[in-house]
UniProtKB/Swiss-Prot annotation:
It comes from Bordetella pertussis (strain Tohama I / ATCC BAA-589 / NCTC 13251). CDD domains: Cis_IPPS. This is Isoprenyl transferase. Mg(2+) binds at D24, E211. PROSITE patterns: UPP_SYNTHASE. Gene3D superfamilies: Decaprenyl diphosphate synthase-like. Homodimer.
Amino acid sequence: MALSSTQAIPETGDIPRHVAIIMDGNGRWATRRHLPRTAGHAKGVHAVRRVVEACGRRGVRYLTLFAFSSENWRRPADEVSLLMRLFVQALEREVDKLQDQGVRLHVVGDLSAFEPKLQELIAQAQERTEHNDRLHLTVAANYGGRWDILQATRAMLRADPGLAQDPDRIDEARLAEHLSMAWAPEPDLFIRTGGEQRISNFLVWQLAYAEFYFTEQFWPDFGADELDAAFEWYRTRERRFGRTSAQLRGGAKR
């Protein structure tokens, strides 16, 4: 299980070890160009490819992308249908590239809601890349932070039914080991494109001590230069994890 930022002080550096991104603004990017919203989602796939490659080159070890939230089912049916098709196409087209780049793919979320073909493709892609370790790419699909905490609670109680009668034995570490990304360190840097400033039910537990970076740039236009700007901002942050600035003097700020 990964180290918790509320239980210990994680090691940090100039390059965030774990970057989490809400890829927002696809629809607005398309609307401003008098294109259907679906065109923006298609263009956003290219941005994913750019950012995965850029993170790998810069030494990021974990990249988590919010692809489809549990609330996105509320969108128009044709848009949801296209997003599902894009997911299928990306898995079919990109898995060989991920393998060549040493990228391990993880998909987290309630995958039972997807069609069997998509579930099968997800399983195959994860199995194909499971021995890679250069970059861990996690795609959150039909994911919600509250769902994650609920499913972890249920899994914890199934693993140890006696906890229901002795709740004082429940602590952060016991619950955290059942979260969908228990194997990964908590994000150091959270990025949201598109100008909105909220986390939208993404990694509610895991973002406790992440640095939050918001940019007006729409996701289809986001690439290596924009990622470098986020990293440059990140290097200015004083990551205290509950300590005072005085305690950090003479040592590393992050």
